[in-house]
Amino acid sequence: TTNTKIPLYQDPGWSEGFDVVVHNECLAAVKDKAFVENVVRPHREGLPALLIHCAMHCYRTGDDQWFEFVGMQSPGHGPHYSFTVDNMKPAHPIMKGFGSKFVAPKGELYHSIKLFDTATVLGQANRRGDNKPQVCVWTNSYGDGKVFATTIGHYNETMAEPKYLDMVTRGLLWACG
């Protein structure tokens, strides 16, 4: 369910021994601020993070507690369809080799309503209907931690694309570097 508190995160020392954490959980109904603080604190203190897809919708505590870590706020997504991601920073180490565009063969384009000053947009796609650009690949500085995030990745068909896998790998290496 989206109201599950992962037991690991309840331990104040949960992150000890981790070099990086990949967040791909979808726990929007968890609203306990102390619990969320326990999740984000290690990242603020320098633990690198990689955020995939539904992780952007987690921990809706009624404020920006989770979204400051993420670097962007998204209230949800539109219908499922293929979309084209434009490379906004081709010289960035994460986006090298990405090319000028990437077609997500299947997906959910998340709506981006707030980008924090600590975030850098690397890729965006235009939303169907109003053609408004939506951030879908970015980095974020969170305290002493580095975060790489992408809303792309709902379907296995997209996540199996070599260009997607290369981008996620470079994002992980960037966050750890």
Per-range role (PLM):
Residues 14, 34-35, 62, 134, ...:
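Residues at alpha-helix caps and immediate loop-helix transition turns in enzyme cores, especially N-
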Residues 65-73, 102-106, 113-119, 163-177:
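Oxidoreductase and adenylate-handling cofactor-binding alpha/beta cores
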